[in-house]
Amino acid sequence: TVDSASMVTESGYNKEENTIDTQAYTSTILEESADAGESYIDETLFLGDSNTARMYRMFDYCSYDNAIGSVGMSARNLATFACVQLSTSSSYVTMSQAVAKLQPRRVILTFGTNDLNPSYKAADFVKNYQAGIETVVAAYPSVDILVNSIPPIGQQHSNQSLTQTQVDEYNKALVEMCQEKGWKFLNSAEVLKDAATGYAKSGYVETSDGIHLTRSAMDALFNYIRTHSYITEDDRPALTTIPKHTGDKDAVTYTVPVVSSTASTEEPVSSESEYIEDSSSSEENVNYVEATPTPE
């Protein structure tokens, strides 16, 4: 739990500065659709950080069958961090390798909160994120790629490295990346943001940290996902036996090489570390804890 005295605020935030011109990205940003229902959620694989982990570990919006979340994980780790355990092996695999085994129709990726850092520019963020997504596509070419916006933070939050200004900058860069690569952008931030302030709506982030999404926010998010659906012809090859997702590895600190031309290679401090218990591992410079499904 974070003491309220340690909460920080951002000065000089201009909510209009990095507004996404939705008219310029009509073929990329998912438009409102009829409600695609729970079946759409069930056939989607959610990949992300702690807000994705909360979808199935804390709440019941998805399950271990269709979601993989690693607390503290950043987009730059997507290609290399072995954080997924499947029933076919005792070893951990990367999310990309897991996608190839789980064979979903589509993936929705939600990363970026743990990349936020004043020294890490948007251009370098998307360069590394794109490289990670490309490993997903290479592992399972039939999958549809939907990149979700980074959720807004509260006006008061617990990590001084985070600003809503940079969240907006990153999201604007993500739309451009998706348009260039032919991927779809799920602009869910528009339903999570308070239009008057540009920050998360009241009650949509935990008061203890101003970062993690609450059940109310998840309700709004999943309604948005179902009503901004992307359903294409199912061109997957004949499915092979699909293993069970049996466990996750949560990253506290994970250092990887960064593709960078303009930014420092300093690893951002995880905005999620207060939610995990520190333990150490000699493997791949990772401190982690493991999460497994609750036995039925």
Cite the ranges covered by each PLM segment:
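Extracellular glycan-modifying ectodomains
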Residues: T1, I29, A34-S39, R54, ...
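Conserved catalytic region of serine esterases and O-acyltransferases that act on ester linkages
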Residues: T1, M7-N14, D219-E296
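Non-catalytic propeptide/linker segments at domain boundaries
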Residues: V2-E38
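Conserved SGNH/GDSL esterase-like catalytic core that processes O-acyl groups on lipids
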Residues: A34-K127
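Loop/turn elements at helix/coil->beta-strand transitions in domains of secreted/extracellular proteins
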Residues: Y40-E43, Q103-V107, Y140-I145, K181-K184
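Active-site segments of SGNH/GDSL-like serine hydrolases
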Residues: T110-N114, V136-D168, E190
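Charged helix-capping and loop-helix junction motifs
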Residues: A122-G132, V167-Y170
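Catalytic His-Asp segment of secreted/periplasmic serine-dependent ester chemistry enzymes
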Residues: I153-V259
